Amino acid sequence: MTVAFNPGEELERFLASLAAATARRLVVVIADNGTEHDVVTAAAQRHGARVVGDGTNLGYGAGANLAAADLEEDWIVVANPDLVWKPGSLDALIDAGLANPAAGCLGPLLLNPDGTVYPSGR
């Protein structure tokens, strides 16, 4: 799931890259936290995602909670819409979780477009 606040092309790239990121069945939910409803709705329709929210800016955390509220999947991934998934990367993240059942939260290695490591998890 992702929280979209007036996304541009990054939402389209995010959704398009998900197909190669996993061989698993995906349920994709977008919390619409901004005013670009047409952009969010069109991208969701192209990629089989569901949109929740009416564009009210609830803040990131409340938007994420809204998107996750009705999910019953074993794994819930919260990702920013400016992320581009590498092929197999979501499978690798879920496999790490399966290999470490005591883990309550997992964080992937994030890379900048130039390949350098982004300092996440600060």
Mark where each language-model region is.
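Glycine-rich, basic loop-to-helix element that forms the pyrophosphate-binding segment
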Residues: 53-71
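The conserved acidic donor/metal-binding loop of glycosyltransferases
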Residues: 80-84
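Conserved donor NDP-sugar-binding/catalytic core segment of glycosyltransferases
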Residues: 87-119
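Active-site beta-to-alpha loop of glycosyltransferases that engages the nucleotide-sugar donor
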Residues: 2-13, 34
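A conserved acidic beta->alpha catalytic loop
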Residues: 24, 30-40
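Short aromatic/hydrophobic "clamp" motif used to bind/position activated sugar donors
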Residues: 76
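Conserved short acidic donor-positioning loop in nucleotide-sugar-dependent glycosyltransferases
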Residues: 18, 32-36, 58
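Short, acidic, metal-binding catalytic loop of nucleotide-sugar glycosyltransferases
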Residues: 16-25
